Design a protein with these regions (language model features):
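Acceptor-substrate binding/catalytic loop of class I
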Residues: 151-168
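A short glycine-rich, Lys/Arg-flanked "PGG" loop and its adjoining helix->strand segment in the class I
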Residues: 123-135
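Conserved class I S-adenosyl-L-methionine
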Residues: 1-42
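Conserved beta-strand signature within the Rossmann-like core of class I S-adenosyl-L-methionine
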Residues: 136-143
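Class I SAM-dependent methyltransferase SAM/SAH-binding core
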Residues: 48, 54-98
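A conserved beta-strand element that flanks and buttresses the S-adenosyl-L-methionine
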Residues: 109-110
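Short "lid" loop at the C-terminus of a central beta-strand within the Rossmann-like core
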Residues: 144-149
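Core SAM-dependent methyltransferase catalytic element
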Residues: 185-202
Length: 202
């Protein structure tokens, strides 16, 4: 199987954005995590979704609950779809590795997006996370369970995924002053996702 884009996976989403929006699971397997986080947020909270795609279903969940959200994605096609879906919401065309909004948020989500970054790029993201989080803010992200790379077909394109080892994520979180609130491996109630929830404690 021919391998594709490794460094900038968002370029693949520029090709398959419409397919992805139509075929992404719509059964809200993330619901339990979103419900948990919603209970931790005030009505004045601000949410940043890194790799927001077309905004469904995660940003849509918070929008429907009256929470102020900002979506970031490096794929032009995904941002275009997001703006169509939620015209009153702020969306930014930016690479999550290379931006600074000069804003603080109560929650940062990198759900099924962080793991599209090469392993060498992932450690620096924890600086981005803490730069954009308020004290006691929540970080929610998904990862693999061991260091390595995986390729998977989506919309006729071979999509790159990468992960560090679980111990490496634990070390990075601790070094950047995050307290792990929960870590579920291959959560059967969430499509087999490996889900981290941590709180920034500067």
């Amino acid at each position: 199987m021919e391998k594709g884009e490794r460094k900038n996976v968002y370029k693949v989403y520029n090709k398959i954005g419409h397919w992805f929006a139509e075929n992404r699971y719509a059964d809200s397997v993330e619901q339990a995590y979103l419900n948990d986080i919603l209970q931790r947020l005030s009505t004045e909270a601000k949410v940043l979704d890194l790799g927001c795609g077309d905004g469904k279903p995660i940003l849509e969940y918070f929008i429907n609950h009256g929470i102020n959200v900002v979506g970031v994605d490096a794929s032009e096609q995904m941002i275009e779809l997001a703006k169509i879906n939620f015209p009153s919401t702020r969306f930014l065309l930016k690479d999550m590795r290379e931006f600074d909004l000069d804003e603080k948020f109560d929650l940062i989500i990198a759900w099924h997006s962080f793991f599209h970054l090469p392993a060498d790029d992932q450690p620096n993201m924890f600086t981005v996370f803490k730069r954009h989080l308020k004290p006691n803010g929540i970080l929610l992200f998904t990862s693999g369970t061991e260091r390595g790379e995986v390729w998977g077909m989506n919309g006729g394109e071979n999509l790159f995924h990468a992960s560090l080892a679980t111990t490496e994520y634990q070390t990075l979180l601790q070094a950047n002053k995050f307290e792990v609130l929960s870590h579920k491996i291959n959560d059967p109630d969430c499509g087999g996702a490996n889900v981290w929830m941590a709180q920034y404690k500067p």
